[in-house]
Curated annotation (Swiss-Prot):
WD repeats lie at residues 11-54, 64-103, 127-166, 169-208, 228-279, 301-347, 351-392. The modification Phosphoserine is found at residues 416, 436, 456, 465. The keyword DNA-binding does not apply. This is Chromatin assembly factor 1 subunit B. The keyword Transport does not apply. GO terms for biological process: DNA repair; DNA replication; DNA replication-dependent chromatin assembly; nucleosome assembly. Residues 403-572 are annotated as: Disordered.
Length: 572
């Protein structure tokens, strides 16, 4: 492991707030994006020098933001770069393959001539009212989430450039957001000292974590302490992260109280138990502010080496058939951990004069980049095999996103009758736990079904009644077994649905039949009863429809009022 702080004016010696490596199988070079107070986003190329240290080469200057840029994040494929800043907008950049540079009014001609790559803005996402602090992509690259000073978190449809949902439960700045690699959760961390975990399918809060029990008081009462730092923490960011397989959630800015002592820490949450942390990673120095995981999976170390290295047994973060490495950045240092032990195996300090701001791993795990508000960046390089032996094949993940859930829902509705399958699917969906970690894509197609089924009774008075029609046809068929011709009329006439069910209504309507149909009186046998039904159908609508439409309109308005809160909560 070698550390070097490059003497480069990354952003005109202004504070550097964020950096991110480009991942993806199609890219042959280590491309790095950086952003800072000078309102620019810059692209760099990294190589390993003969001495094993990093060599940096400038590639492009992306000038479009009007204020400081707080975060840059490449999409999972590396094709699109998202940047968010104090101007409350998110820009989506894409590299332009054409050799002719794009005419940009935001940068000088001299700066444009220095660009070796041409990047253009393909989308501008507007929705936040204040500074954008953090961005995280979904695993499939179709969706993205952002956190802002306006206390909100927004889920974006990247292809359409539109907002899908807005989460506004936080009471203060949202300084970090991460998307579960399996697509089930979105976790946010705010300076209101609350960690909120949202369910992406239900689009609502699944867990609120803010306090932890610390034992009993002198009188036997339960004591608790706040798990996260308040707004006095000297950092704009609290960048939390899921592990690449989604098994663990790592949250910085933690504080553990033991009597009068307060220890800065990073909490570790298990996917199977998100209500409280399973472990914490203490930081001897200042508060932690960012956690980033190496994208490479490694083989487990031999048990003998683990036992020799640890004097006492580790609290065992998680029992996995592989090992994952992650870095935790505090205000003045970086600690390196893996999932096989609870204490760090690496420690980097005394590299910057001011607070650190962000960290990022290269796609092969060879580089760890560190940015600081002093205007410089540091690179930690690892030799081949220094972190461990990489797995030959990555684990296969079953990914769920709101977009795929909607598509599956539409497919089930298009390919099945609305009456039978929707009712049959309801009990099975209610018995399953949608928040269970070991879920497959098949339950996700059924997870939205309960909400649609609950809404179906309220939608019946509005004019579309898929469920009652089959049942009404079954009740009318015994009354007219020998009448095959009038059946089309009964299907098209909605006014026959109410009085055709019960016999008392037919008895009350016998005087109307004699008044409205005087001509067919000579036919008074059993056949006239069937013939009278035919002329009544066109004769009764002037009287029956007002009785049926009025309650339907009233019910429709009532249902609209009742459905308004539910729909708003789903779309938020």
């Amino acid at each position: 492991m070698k550390v070097i702080t490059c003497e480069i004016a990354w952003h005109n010696k202004e504070p550097v707030y964020s950096l991110d490596f480009q991942h993806g199988a199609t890219w042959k070079i280590h491309r790095l994006a950086s952003a800072g107070v000078d309102t620019a986003v810059r692209i760099w190329k990294l190589e390993r020098g003969p001495d094993g240290k990093a060599i940096v080469e400038f590639l492009s200057n992306l000038a479009r933001h009007t204020k400081a840029v707080n975060v840059v994040r490449f999409s999972p494929t590396g094709e699109i770069l998202a940047s968010g800043g104090d101007d409350a907008v998110i820009l989506l950049w894409k590299m332009n393959d054409s050799k002719e540079p794009e005419q940009i009014a935001f940068q000088d001609e001299e700066e444009a001539q220095l660009n070796k790559e041409n990047w253009t803005v393909v989308k501008t996402l507007r929705g936040h009212l204040e500074d954008v602090y953090d961005i995280c992509w979904a695993t499939d690259g179709n969706l993205m989430t952002s956190a802002s000073v306006d206390n909100t978190v927004i889920i974006w449809d990247v292809s359409k450039g539109q907002k899908i949902s807005i989460f506004n439960e936080h009471k203060s700045y949202v300084q970090g957001v991460t998307w579960d690699p399996l697509g089930q959760y979105i976790a946010t961390l705010s300076c209101d000292r609350v960690l909120r975990i949202y369910n992406t399918q239900k689009k609502r809060v699944a867990f609120n974590i803010s306090k932890m029990l610390s034992g009993q008081g002198p009188e036997g009462e339960a004591r608790s302490f706040r798990m996260f730092h308040d707004d006095s923490m000297k950092s704009f960011f609290r960048r939390l992260s899921f592990t690449p397989d989604g098994s663990l959630l790592l949250t910085p800015a933690g504080c553990m109280e033991s009597g009068e002592n307060v220890t800065n820490t990073t909490y570790v949450f298990s996917r199977k138990h998100l209500k409280r942390p399973i472990a914490h990673l203490p930081c001897p120095g200042k508060a932690t502010l960012a956690v980033r995981c190496c994208p490479v999976y490694f083989e487990l170390r031999p048990v003998a080496e683990t036992e020799k290295a640890s004097e006492e047994p580790s609290p065992e973060l998680v029992n996995l058939p592989y090992r994952m490495v992650f870095a935790v950045a505090s205000e003045d240092s970086v600690l390196l951990y893996d999932t096989q032990q609870s204490f760090p195996f690496g420690y980097v300090s005394n590299i910057h004069y001011h607070t650190l701001s962000d960290i990022s791993w290269s796609s092969d795990g060879a580089f760890l980049a560190i940015s600081s508000t002093d205007g410089y960046c540091t690179f930690v390089t690892f030799e081949k095999g220094e972190l461990g032996i990489p797995l030959k094949e990555k684990p296969v993940l079953s990914i769920r996103t709101p977009d795929t859930a909607k598509k599956a829902k539409n497919q089930t509705h298009q390919g099945s009758s609305p009456g039978s399958r929707s009712v049959e699917g309801t009990p099975s969906n209610r018995t399953q736990d949608p928040s269970s970690p070991c879920t497959t894509p098949s339950p996700t197609t059924q997870s939205p079904a309960p909400s649609a089924i609950k809404d179906s009774p309220s939608a019946i008075p509005a004019g579309k009644s898929p469920l009652p029609q089959p049942s009404e046809e079954k009740t009318l068929q015994p009354a007219g077994q020998n009448m095959k011709a009038p059946q089309p009329r009964r299907v098209t006439l909605n006014t026959l649905q109410t009085w055709g069910k019960t016999a008392p209504r037919r008895i009350n309507l016998t005087p109307l039949k004699t008044d409205t149909v005087p001509n067919p009186q000579p036919n008074s046998g059993t056949a006239p009863s069937t013939e009278e039904v035919q002329p009544e159908a066109p004769g009764e609508p002037p009287e029956e429809p007002p009785e049926l439409k009025r309650p339907r309109l009233e019910e429709r308005e009532g249902d609209a009022q009742n459905l308004a809160p539910d729909d708003s909560s789903k779309t938020v």
